[in-house]
Amino acid sequence: MITGDACHEMAEGEILNDILTHVPLHKCTIYGDRVLSAKLSKRLSCAIKHLPIRLKFNYNSSAEDAIALGIRKDPTLVLDGEIFIEGLIQAEEITRRFEEFL
């Protein structure tokens, strides 16, 4: 395991796998209501903690901001400015998408 117990709801500004300073830091924003955003955040931390990636988490619950970006599902993960995950998908699918991204 790369970090301690990484399966938890990520806090605003928290960095997943922060000790991996040799890999780029990616910025992600989760758009949606607090409950679904928290579920996606926890699912993300569990699904990708073993991958060589660092993610800085931010949250945005503004419907206006989401609509302006073309977001259609709640919650949605925007990774480095691009819509990456829409909806509360399974952890295995999250892992697969990040493996392909890397």
Language-model regions, residue ranges each:
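Helix-enriched interaction subdomains in cytosolic or periplasmic regions
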Residues: M1-C7
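Local sequence-structure signature of Cys/Sec-based thiol-disulfide redox active-site neighborhoods
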Residues: E9-H50
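Small/polar loops that bind or transfer phosphate-bearing groups
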Residues: G32, N58, E86
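Generic recognition of short, well-ordered alpha-helical segments
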Residues: K39-R43, R72, I89
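Non-catalytic interaction surface on structured domains
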Residues: S41-L44, R54, E93, F98
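Thiol-based oxidoreductase modules, predominantly thioredoxin-like and allied folds used
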Residues: I53-D65
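Structural micro-motif
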Residues: G70-L77
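Non-catalytic, surface beta->alpha helical segment in thiol-disulfide oxidoreductase systems
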Residues: D80-L102
